[in-house]
UniProtKB/Swiss-Prot annotation:
InterPro entries reported in the protein's UniProt record: Hexapep, LpxD, Trimer_LpxA-like_sf, UDP_GlcNAc_AcTrfase_non-rep
Enzyme Commission number(s) from the entry: 2.3.1.191
Subunit structure, interactors included: Homotrimer.
SUPFAM superfamilies according to UniProt: Trimeric LpxA-like enzymes
Keywords: Acyltransferase, Lipid A biosynthesis, Lipid biosynthesis, Lipid metabolism, Repeat, Transferase
Pfam families: Hexapep (PF00132), LpxD (PF04613)
The encoding gene: lpxD
Organism phylogeny: Bacteria, Pseudomonadati, Campylobacterota, Epsilonproteobacteria, Campylobacterales
UniProt name for this protein: UDP-3-O-acylglucosamine N-acyltransferase
Amino acid sequence: MKLSELLSAYSIETEFSNDFEVHALAELDKATPNDISYIDQVCYLKLLKDSKAGAVFIRKKESSKVPKSMQALIVDNPHLAFAKVSHAFKIPFFKNPQSVNEPKHFEKVTIMPNVVIGEGVEIGENSLIYPGVVIADGVKIGKNCILYPRVILYQNTILEDNVIIHAGSVIGGDGFGYAHTALGEHVKIEHVGIVRIQKNVEIGANTAIDRAVFGETLIKEGVKIDNLVQIGHNCVLGEHSIVVSQVGLSGSTTTGRNVVFGGQVGIGGHLHVGEFTQIGGKSAVGKDLPPNTNFAGAIPAMEIHEWHHFLAHLRTNFRKQQKTSLLQKAKGFFKS
């Protein structure tokens, strides 16, 4: 689709000089000359210098930063413009829904009844697919994988070898991404990325891992994820990390290797947790955490030694207040 056609289709008014063929939406640092990107935060302006994107949605006050090799598509709300045009690149779950009824054959794979498989799916030998599993178009499954009942793999999801996914989990669903109009309406951002799960990963029941806006949501080798976990779009979980039940990772959270998330931990978006760091249950993390540390506490999470001192201080002061209150009551009783 030509740039002019794309902008016209979604009623986006902006000036441009080169009406090139648009192939995709992409991150600035990974874009090609036929891709469009956007900037709605000043911190990303530094990426413009080395970007190969053909065009970028950007506000007028920041447009002078755009290099001559790239077109500045000046709009009031770059995020909203990006959300609108993303609908032109939506990837269907099943491109040809009728094809799911056609028989498909996979060598040395056990597929039980009532499994639904789309077009272009690859499944490695010795994999086991239980009843009720749904596999969308373009999914690639490695060797020795096990998908328990009612697992759903969205389009183009990649599972490497020896991956186990327990019942009811959804891999590759839409991330929670919306742009907002001046009237407060929410415009959905179509996610055109994927989820990649590397080898020897196990995922518990009823867990959701959202696909990337573009690029990959990546679960690295050896990660173990419990039941009822939510992992947002574009997250990266480092090798051999452990994620306990009811953890929620907001979009673009990244971690080093061997990180441990205790139950019900919540992580704000676009944060990094360093390798070998452990976070105690129910902690709320709102900043980057350094490697090789232990954190705990509700809001906000703090280094575990600080948390212990805080609790001790809180307990001591509370007991002092209780004693003071009892003495005051006793004095009042004897005076009466």
